Amino acid sequence: MPVKVYAEEMEGESMKKKKLSETPLPKIKKRKMKNGDTEDLDLEHMAESVNGEINNNNPTPKLKKKKKPAPISDLSETAEECDGEQPDPSTPTPKKVKKKKIKESKEDSDTQEEAEQSEPQTNGVKSVKKSKKNITSDDNEPAPKKRKTDTTEITTAKECEEKVLTKEEQDINQEKIDGDFSKFPLSKETIKNLQAKGVSYLFPIQSKTFHTAYSGKDVVVQARTGTGKTFSFAIPLVEKLNEDQQPLARGRAPRVIILTPTRELAIQITNEIRSITKKLKVSCFYGGTPYQQQVFAIKDGIDFLVGTPGRVRDLVQNYRLDLTTLKHVVLDEVDMMFDMGFSEQVEEILSVRYKADPEENPQTLLFSATCPDWMYNMAKKYMRKQFEKIDLIGHRSQKAATTVEHLAIECTRSQKAAVLGDLVQVYSGSHGKTIIFCDSKLEAHTLATSCGSLKQSAKSLHGDLQQKEREVVLKGFRQGTFEVLIATNVAARGLDIPEVDLVVLYSAPKEADAYVHRSGRTGRAGRTGVCISLYEPWERHYLRNVERSTGITFKRVGVPSLLNVAKSSSADAIKSLDTVPADVIEHFKEYAQELIEQKGALTAIAAALAHISGATSIKQRSLLNMEAGCDTITLKSSVPIHSLSYAWQSIKEQLGDDVDSKIHRMCLLKDSMGVCFDVRSENLESMQERWTDTKQWQFTVATELPAIQESERNFDGPRNRGFGGRGRRPFDRRNNSRNSNRGGGGRGRNRNGGFRRGR
């Protein structure tokens, strides 16, 4: 009866364990802990005591020599050495025996199997296993087990962290995999030139369009600005021309023509193509430059011709520019090209090479950030029937750049120039690059020459400048000669100016497409940027139209607070101190010591930072409408309110009935949990002294504009501009007869046709 014998042995060993548990182990543990030993050493001593009891209290010297605790997995070997017996190789470890004991409690067949396997074991091993179990129950959790569990937890935490990091970088890693150079038929020379420019893989737009363009198919590509559209057609066409191995004879006609709407974009594309090929001849033709140099280029021979429609057409008509051998035609920024009235010029240029049968026409590639329906209809006119559409934006996704934060600030026209300096200082700093877009040339010139709030150097860029002047301005801006570029729409499309931190639209964006391109001057090539739109109260509907068309959401913010301006100015001032040479500092230490003795170290340094940053006079402004000398107050309620009159009543109860003349522009918060209003800075202190917060109302000075409910007033036009309400009957100013379409007066409000004088 092996099972019965095993059970009796178990009972005997259990009695021994009970006796051992009565030994004064806790005292030994307390003494050892007092001497600075760990709980692991107690475990060792207890194992020795157990083995000594089993082996007539003769512990093995080996255990006394050990300073480090033995792991639980090695406890059986230690016990066997204590018993003075040689370990049997066939003997399983206590861990395995423990598993067999668990099986014993499940089924009788398992119990029989376990008993047969346990018969060859010595009594000493069994005793040690049971003693270990008793130790575990007495000391709750042995230290080695805790260490093992903690290690597992740490490993799991590291694995989770690695998973999170992998998820964040998954998109970038996938782009690198998809754009790996080995997946494309690129020559060694092209790869070398790309790597010299810091390009280690093709961007998504480049990888997705390469094979289509390389195979000779017609394609229409829509992608956001700043995603690398130039290389998406330049790289495959360079490889195609290199494969042709056509003799590069003098006077050869161009095989590729690239038409762009602006001169600046043409120059940029030319430089990009030249950077990846040294063998092929790339020429750039645009207006505002002498014809002679361009005629010499035609006689010398051209492979890539980049130009604007007007100048290219003139060269075709008057200087024998041969386009009959064109194999590839690229139209970049197609929507803008046709919006600017270049459609007739483009058709004249293409008619030289395009035939009635589309299959005989050259490969046509259209690229744009926006692709309206009319553009697809135009594509059918020049392209083969089986042309491809590659849309990297989609109809439902955001069409503007995703790396740009879109902000909107409401202020009147008279206040825009005054707050412009603070916006540039906070969002770009003294050393960042900013582009300010204006609607007119006069406005751009005026801001560049007489905007007193701008501390940074600024220059204007508009159509009245000669081409040479425009190139000098753009070159200076790229090289950091000045920090602020004030431009008209000439700089809105296609220009790849690196590291632009801020874009400011001096007026509300009227068209969604124009906003997409203007805001796309920042946040390029993986960088982040900010685009701020300044709008007047009556221009809110323009923002809503842009939001609906592009899928973005403007974040309504106020002008930077006094604290934010001081913080940004101080950061720039501290940064500028690093540029002062050490030998120069030595000459100023004596005067610095005198200043510290006079004013104190803290006051002296603060005054120096303010002067260095140019922030000697910082005006507090309203966050609601940018009016100087006003503070914005937030009065938060513990319960929702739906009427301003309720807030007025509570304010008058504490501050008196005359307070209504001191509070301006009150409006409800967006969540209806309070109101927001302006007070004059000279009245703020007295209000704070008289006001006492209650359970319902909390009075705070706002440091940033809270989300407020937009008022619908003034949506029918500018306030006090002389436009009436309901009447729409025209009139003539000279004879007061209603036969002109310029008016529209309010019926019964003014006898002079509805045009009222501003109050």
UniProtKB/Swiss-Prot annotation:
Basic residues bias (residue ranges): 748-759
Principal localisation: nucleus
- Which stretch carries the motif DEAD box? 332-335
Name the InterPro entries on file.
DEAD/DEAH_box_helicase_dom, DEAD_box_RNA_helicase, GUCT, Helicase_ATP-bd, Helicase_C-like, P-loop_NTPase, RBD_domain_sf
What GO CC annotations are associated with the protein? cytosol; mitochondrion; nucleolus; nucleoplasm
Instruction: Extract the ranges annotated as region (Disordered).
Output: 1-154, 709-759
Keywords tagged on the record: ATP-binding, Cytoplasm, Helicase, Hydrolase, Mitochondrion, Nucleotide-binding, Nucleus, Repeat, RNA-binding, rRNA processing, Transcription
Q: Boundaries of each Helicase ATP-binding domain copy? A: 210-389
Statement: the UniProt record of this protein carries the keyword Ribosomal protein: no
Q: Which GO terms describe its molecular function?
A: 7SK snRNA binding; ATP binding; ATP hydrolysis activity; RNA helicase activity; rRNA binding; snoRNA binding
Task: Point to the regions of Basic and acidic residues compositional bias.
Answer: 710-719
Chain positions of motif Q motif: 179-207
Q: Which subcellular locations apply to this protein?
A: Nucleus, Nucleolus; Nucleus, Nucleoplasm; Cytoplasm, Cytosol; Mitochondrion
The record's catalysed reaction(s) read:
ATP + H2O = ADP + phosphate + H(+)
Q: Where does this protein hold ATP?
A: A223, R224, T225, G226, T227, G228, K229, T230
Q: Which Gene3D superfamilies match?
A: 3.30.70.2280, P-loop containing nucleotide triphosphate hydrolases
UniProt enzyme class: hydrolase
Q: In which tissues is it expressed?
A: Widely expressed. Expressed at higher level in stomach. Expressed at higher level compared to ddx21-b.
Q: Where is the composition biased (Acidic residues)?
A: 77-86
| GO BP of this protein | R-loop processing; rRNA processing; transcription by RNA polymerase II
Domain Helicase C-terminal, which positions? 422-566
Q: Kindly indicate whether the keyword Nucleus belongs to this entry.
A: yes
Enzyme Commission numbers on file: 3.6.4.13
**What family, per the record?**
Belongs to the DEAD box helicase family. DDX21/DDX50 subfamily.
Q: What does this protein do?
A: RNA helicase that acts as a sensor of the transcriptional status of both RNA polymerase (Pol) I and II: promotes ribosomal RNA (rRNA) processing and transcription from polymerase II (Pol II). Binds various RNAs, such as rRNAs, snoRNAs, 7SK and, at lower extent, mRNAs. In the nucleolus, localizes to rDNA locus, where it directly binds rRNAs and snoRNAs, and promotes rRNA transcription, processing and modification. Required for rRNA 2'-O-methylation, possibly by promoting the recruitment of late-acting snoRNAs SNORD56 and SNORD58 with pre-ribosomal complexes.
Q: What is this protein called?
A: Nucleolar RNA helicase 2-A
Name the encoding gene, please: ddx21-a
